[in-house]
């Protein structure tokens, strides 16, 4: 709370864990507790939540592509009873930023995307491909630069 009270920024991974699965998991309550805790101690604050989508082309290999997408800032309503609403707003915002493959078709969909070399870090490209339209971008190998990108 001290950082927030001094108009600092705090990075929180609200899902509370990581997974190789390309979908949004339930968000933990920690980020709303921090925001409302800071507001309780310092009511003149105007905290904002900025959704950040982080996606990897290859989770298990070095030198893969990483796409970081920032969403629009979401103001924290001063009323602490709105914490659940804030969580849902952030969850919805994240779904607009990252690839979110439904569980029901996950294995088939992911296999189809990878076999067709669709950039699985690009939400628009994935949605475009899944709509049945031809893709405009494919992931390219970096040739001799491979495995050097992460070591710079």
Task: Say what each PLM segment does.
Residues 1-152:
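Non-catalytic C-terminal accessory region of glycerolipid acyltransferases
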């Amino acid at each position: 709370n001290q950082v927030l009270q001094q108009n600092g920024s705090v990075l929180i991974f609200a899902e509370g864990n990581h997974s190789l699965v390309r979908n949004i998991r339930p968000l933990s309550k920690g980020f709303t507790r921090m925001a409302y805790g800071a507001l309780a101690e310092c009511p003149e604050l105007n905290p904002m939540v900025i959704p950040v989508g982080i996606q990897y082309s290859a989770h298990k290999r070095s030198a893969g592509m990483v796409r970081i997408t920032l969403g629009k800032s979401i103001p924290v309503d001063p009323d602490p009873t709105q914490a659940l609403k804030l969580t849902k707003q952030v969850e919805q915002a994240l779904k607009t930023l990252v690839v979110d493959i439904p569980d029901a078709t996950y294995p088939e969909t992911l296999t189809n995307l990878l076999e067709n070399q669709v950039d699985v870090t690009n939400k628009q490209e994935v949605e475009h491909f899944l709509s049945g339209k031809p893709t405009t971008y494919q992931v390219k190998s970096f040739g001799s630069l491979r495995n050097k990108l992460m070591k710079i």
